[in-house]
């Protein structure tokens, strides 16, 4: 079964041609870096031996005072100035004297769903064996850092899936927060007016709860209340969304996980699926146009990768016409979700339609990026602004022990989402 194409055809083809052309004409410089952290970090400050403090990793598009915020870019690393202040989202962590152990790797300007970074190196997916598997982007280093135990919690950003996709690829937990909940001051932008969010990642739900408590004061108490209100899955009603193109093994794993958790599960109607598909397209349009609005000054800079330039130039083709058209449909999509959440507590679907893809030994990476973009089920959530949780669940597969369940909630339902994630996690064998 073929996957959905979510880009305007002419713009898509032009962007592809640009990327293929430029990629074949440039040889990227590679920054030398220690392999001890598997490229998870751009800057790493290892904690002392036997340190008992919470270790927090921060994606390198979030300002840390005194450090250049590279946004995953050679050009910015070499020309940027150290941040004069911490990003606002670090305020609680600083108040509590949480140990920040480094700035994590990411896709350049957060614009790649694969997590590949030609300059800083691509973080190694823990499931890589004979073939290197994509770590997922753009918060690739944040996902691999918590998986490898090099941080207890990592902060990532999510404009179109950039927390949930790497969480899915690397088998960790990632939370996309409600749009506007966490301040974006001091965060390198993609589309900050409608899409950009900051969210926590961890090896399990408990660590993500800790991460949310560092982003929102009083969150731990709200989470405890959510657990007390609905301690079991039998009290939670789930709307199950099935999407064309999904690997049957993944759908089976999700249905089994929901059954083990004893959720009340009801299938969502075909009409909702059609609206979801349109929201995915509109969200992608806004993300690409946002890249042009935020990053157009880098489109001709030496040191910015050709694939990144292609995405920025694609945004130029989509802005303002298709961008404004998508924006006009946003309220209707939010209303559609609002109506669904009158009937269910959460929506469940795969984070990715297929298992994480291998990085080709030879061939154009642009084609890989396009394929990843077309198998992630994340952008419609950003388009609406709702929160969503990616949590690993067991799967019967020859190469991967887990796949990723995505749960979508009402605005500001992060505590309830994590309670549902806890139930799923506890029910896993």
What positions do the PLM features span?
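Short pre-catalytic strand/loop immediately N-terminal to key active-site residues, enriched for Gly-Thr
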Residues: 76-83, 123-137
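Short helix-loop capping/hinge segments that flank enzyme active sites or metal/cofactor-binding pockets
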Residues: 53-76, 282-334, 390-401
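Bacterial N-terminal signal peptides that target proteins for export
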Residues: 2-13
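Short, well-ordered alpha-helical
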Residues: 24-82, 86-87, 107-112, 356
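Structural helix-boundary/capping segments
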Residues: 27, 99, 148, 153, ...
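Gly/Ser-rich, acidic/histidine-flanked active-site/gating loops
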Residues: 56, 62, 68, 89-95, ...
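Bacterial N-terminal signal peptides
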Residues: 13-21
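Serine-dependent amide/ester hydrolase catalytic core
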Residues: 294-383
